[in-house]
């Protein structure tokens, strides 16, 4: 299946299949009762999501939205879980997938724990370039989302981006 920028793959609270992201980039947003949204995760190519449902089913934790054009394989839940039961060696493959995700999260923690806001932003921009070049970070995320992801205020992100533009 092809998803275009801004299209939704699944909604928070629903249940359904798992998905393999072949190409593109997805964001996972958590919607609160007041309607506000917070960016909680980014999904890169070759990930199978939702991560928390790789071994047993659970409702979707957030809403998945395409940041750029994505190619996605639908993995029917019943088939996925039956294959796990029939082939216990697949649990090792899932453990390796989750290990890779944890390592990526450690890299993101390194980005967020940088001392200066400017360095946090620079590292996030560099990480994104591997997936979205020639587009830029601000082509796919709002300043609010960048701030949420880095633990910074939108105003700080705006100031840093203006400073970068001025120094070029």
Q: Model-derived features: where do they sit?
A:
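Short acidic-glycine-tyrosine-enriched beta hairpin
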Residues: 1-2, 7, 33-49
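Regulatory nucleotide-sensing modules
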Residues: 1-23
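Short beta-strand segments in beta-sandwich/barrel cores
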Residues: 8, 25-30, 48, 71-72
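Short beta-strand His + acidic residue motifs that chelate non-heme Fe in jelly-roll/DSBH
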Residues: 28-29, 51, 62-66, 149
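Short aromatic/basic micro-patch
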Residues: 42, 74, 140
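Ligand-binding loop in jelly-roll beta-barrel domains
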Residues: 55-78
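A small-molecule sensor/coupling module
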Residues: 79-116
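Phosphate-/nucleic-acid-contacting segments
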Residues: 120, 124-168
């Amino acid at each position: 299946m092809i998803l275009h920028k801004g299209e939704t793959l699944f909604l928070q609270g629903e249940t359904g299949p798992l998905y393999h992201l072949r190409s593109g980039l997805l964001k996972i947003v958590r919607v609160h009762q007041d309607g506000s949204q917070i960016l909680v995760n980014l999904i890169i190519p070759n990930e199978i999501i939702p991560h928390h449902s790789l071994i047993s089913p659970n409702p979707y934790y957030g809403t998945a939205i395409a940041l750029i054009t994505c190619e996605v394989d639908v993995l029917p839940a019943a088939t996925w879980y039956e294959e796990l039961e029939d082939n216990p060696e697949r649990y090792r493959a899932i453990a390796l997938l989750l290990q890779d995700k944890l390592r990526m999260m450690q890299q993101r923690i390194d980005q967020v724990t940088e001392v200066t806001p400017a360095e946090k932003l620079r590292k996030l921009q560099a990480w994104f370039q591997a997936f979205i070049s020639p587009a830029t970070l601000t082509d796919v995320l709002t300043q609010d989302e960048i701030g949420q992801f880095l633990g910074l205020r939108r105003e700080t992100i705006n100031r840093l981006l203006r400073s970068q533009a001025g120094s070029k």
